[in-house]
């Protein structure tokens, strides 16, 4: 991706969405274009028009943290957008300023045992939306994603390439928008992650829905929320989710799902857990039978 174009488009789209009244500019209502003028952003940020024009052209080299924070306040950026602006500035700096990303690695047995010990649905994905681990009920919950040949175990591919995703996720539009915003956040954090860039290129090439959302330059921290799922075995589920980081493995994120106590979703989730346990027990019995026969 063209880093300068990323910076320029991000700042321009943030500037265009702000009305003069939101920025405290009164009395000037005749505008040919939406949003603030560059000179208004510069004045509110406390920098020269020339300096801001350079920044909006995509040149963040040497821009101080103080200026970035002031610019974030002027543009009314939220936490995710402010972090994204700092990530873009970090990527523009010398190599020593960039945070190293860990090399790809296998999911440790110790973490898999931890995941398996959790009673609620849990799955772990990386920055490229690949599912790298899950417990039995987590695999049962996301079976349509994991088993879909178009997805290849990747939630972004499932959403944008598989027609089944629109049934599985009743709130498909929100899910699609969230995935794109999360991918753009990760792209800002890891601009030289080739696998991530390749995935984004694949999605942009094959999906109009992805391209439209990618052009919006929205970013998001995917931490907590509500997920509605229409599961083929147990029906409709309304689940709260929480995302957790692995400090020793910053490329992975664990998601746990729970239902409100006494709700229909809790009952259906309990049924899904029973079905997952029966499937796991059956698989073990089959494996034990094969071992006995081989012996």
Where are the language model's segments positioned?
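A short, Lys/Arg-rich alpha-helix, primarily the initiator
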Residues: 1-36
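Recognition helix of helix-turn-helix/homeodomain-like DNA-binding domains
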Residues: 28-32, 38-39, 45-62, 70-72
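An N-terminal domain-cap segment
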Residues: 22-36, 95-110, 114-117
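Short amphipathic recognition helices of helix-turn-helix/homeodomain-type DNA-binding modules
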Residues: 1-12, 63-105, 127
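Amphipathic, well-packed alpha-helical segments that form the structural scaffold of globular domains
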Residues: 12-19, 86, 90, 116, ...
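Short polybasic/polar patches that bind polyanions
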Residues: 12, 43, 73, 87, ...
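Hydrophobic protein-protein interaction segments
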Residues: 109-121, 125-126, 131-295
């Amino acid at each position: 991706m063209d880093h300068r174009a990323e910076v320029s488009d991000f700042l321009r789209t943030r500037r265009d969405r702000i009305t003069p009244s939101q920025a405290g500019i009164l009395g000037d209502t005749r505008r040919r274009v939406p949003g603030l003028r560059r000179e208004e952003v510069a004045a509110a940020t406390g920098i020269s028009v020339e300096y801001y024009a350079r920044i909006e052209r995509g040149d963040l080299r040497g821009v101080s943290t103080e200026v970035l924070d002031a610019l974030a306040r002027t543009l009314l950026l939220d936490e995710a957008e402010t972090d994204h602006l700092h990530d873009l500035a970090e990527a523009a700096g010398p190599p020593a300023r960039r945070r190293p990303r860990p090399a790809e690695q296998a999911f440790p047995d110790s973490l898999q045992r931890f995941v398996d010990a959790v009673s609620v649905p849990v799955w772990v994905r990386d920055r490229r939306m690949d599912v790298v681990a899950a417990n039995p009920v987590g695999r049962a919950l996301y079976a349509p994603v994991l088993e879909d040949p178009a997805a290849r175990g990747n939630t972004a591919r499932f959403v944008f390439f598989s027609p089944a995703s629109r049934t599985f996720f009743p709130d498909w539009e929100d899910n699609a928008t969230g995935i794109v915003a999360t991918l753009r956040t990760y792209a800002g954090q890891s601009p030289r992650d080739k696998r991530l860039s390749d995935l984004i290129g694949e999605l942009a090439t094959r999906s109009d829905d992805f391209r439209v959302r990618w052009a919006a330059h929205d970013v998001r921290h995917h931490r907590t929320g509500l997920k509605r799922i229409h599961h083929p075995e147990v029906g409709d589920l309304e689940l709260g989710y929480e995302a957790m980081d692995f400090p020793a493995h910053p490329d992975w994120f664990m998601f746990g799902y729970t239902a409100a106590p006494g709700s229909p979703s809790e009952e259906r989730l309990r049924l899904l857990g029973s079905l997952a346990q029966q499937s796991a027990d059956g698989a073990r019995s089959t494996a034990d039978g094969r071992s006995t026969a081989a012996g």
